[in-house]
């Protein structure tokens, strides 16, 4: 299979798994310890508090949370999040990190697209980059990345185009894109399409390549 898609209206449980990741939507509350996987989360709804290494952190929509494997932590409240377990992670530089993506300045990608960075090596998460992609109406050229990626559609409407075939995208759609797979996420609506992405190896969400292997560069601004 070149890629995988899944849709679920469920507020918990596993969505799907690939060799690099397990992606699911779940209630964060409870006691947690994973000795095998790093975990990166993005809060969708609700609120609460996460306590990691004696530090308390508020959880609300737009909060990104990274917890390294072997780190015990607890959470309270009714916050639900997209959780991505990172299989066989590299040693982390920190036990955890919290980023408020509502306060992050966007970076620029191709075709007028922007992104907000969550968990990254800069905050101690060595294995992956987590981001929210902001996709305006329209279509970018076909391209590929040199990383494996899982995507969760936060809101908006669009299509995933691969090899001349299209699959609809809407809130709750989950996608796994293997590295070097030529594709395009097109926004077919009249408002912004927002997607949550996590990819490995870590890098920049703006790095993309056209099908002939040339680097897709940012267009010049007047």
Kindly give the residue locations of the regions a language model identified.
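Short acidic-glycine-tyrosine-enriched beta hairpin
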Residues: 54-70, 163-180
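Short, conserved beta-strand element in jelly-roll/cupin
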Residues: 35-50, 132-136, 144-161, 198-200
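Structural motif
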Residues: 47-49, 56, 72, 150, ...
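Short, structured motif recognition centered on aromatic/hydrophobic residues
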Residues: 23-25, 40, 44, 59, ...
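Ligand-binding loop in jelly-roll beta-barrel domains
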Residues: 69-93, 171, 179-205
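Short histidine-centered beta-strand/loop micro-motifs
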Residues: 15-17, 29-35, 76, 139-145, ...
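A short, N-terminal "cap"/entry segment at the start of jelly-roll beta-barrel domains
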Residues: 1-31, 80-127, 211-222
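Ordered, small/hydrophobic-rich secondary-structure cores
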Residues: 1-71
